[in-house]
Regions:
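Acidic, proline/glycine-rich low-complexity IDRs
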Residues: 96-142
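Short, surface-exposed beta-edge/turn micro-motifs
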Residues: 28, 90-92, 99-102
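Short, surface-exposed beta-strand/loop "edge" segments at domain boundaries and coil↔beta transitions
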Residues: 11-17, 40, 75-76, 103, ...
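Surface-exposed polar/charged interaction patches
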Residues: 22-25, 62, 122
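Generic structural motif
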Residues: 10, 35, 70-73, 99, ...
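Surface-exposed, low-hydrophobicity interaction/linker segments
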Residues: 33-94
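N-terminal interaction modules that seed assembly of large macromolecular complexes
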Residues: 1-55
Length: 142
């Protein structure tokens, strides 16, 4: 079963912008954490879609972030392991690290195909699907 799409994307701000629009940025709530390893301050916590949209430029300056997407008015779950993610209300989870590596997990296979296609069309490097057989990640943090 498909779990994610991983890739290297230059120009993080542009990548974030496109990912957020492809996944309906304003139609969801977002939770940003795992930002403590950065040289630039970014507020950890819950964001409306509009708040996150306005913070994309600052977000792109980070080296590490975990961004989770939730349906509106949903409680934020504790997600440590992949199993927690699967059992949570979170429908997508983006791990961004080292300033250009992205792992986009989604429970919606169509979303994964859309992001993969977009990545290929826009020259993302090392783009690949992550599935049950090749996903080595169990811990959904850095």
């Amino acid at each position: 079963m498909l779990r994610a799409v991983s890739f290297v994307g230059n120009y993080a701000e542009k990548v974030f912008l496109h990912l957020m629009y492809l996944t309906g940025i304003t139609e969801h709530e977002w939770y940003v954490d795992d930002v403590e390893f950065n040289y630039v301050y970014f507020r950890e916590g819950r964001y409306s879609g509009y708040e996150l949209k306005n913070a994309l430029e600052d977000l792109s300056r980070l080296s590490f972030a975990r961004i989770r997407r939730y349906p509106l008015k949903t409680d934020i779950d504790t997600i440590d392991e992949y199993k927690d993610y699967v059992e949570s209300e979170c429908d997508s989870l983006l791990l961004f690290y080292d300033g250009g590596y992205f792992e986009f997990y989604s429970k919606d296979v169509d979303t994964l195909h859309t992001i993969f296609k977009f990545g290929v069309e826009n020259g993302f490097e090392r783009i690949e699907y992550v599935d049950d057989a090749n996903d080595v990640r169990t811990w959904m943090h850095f």
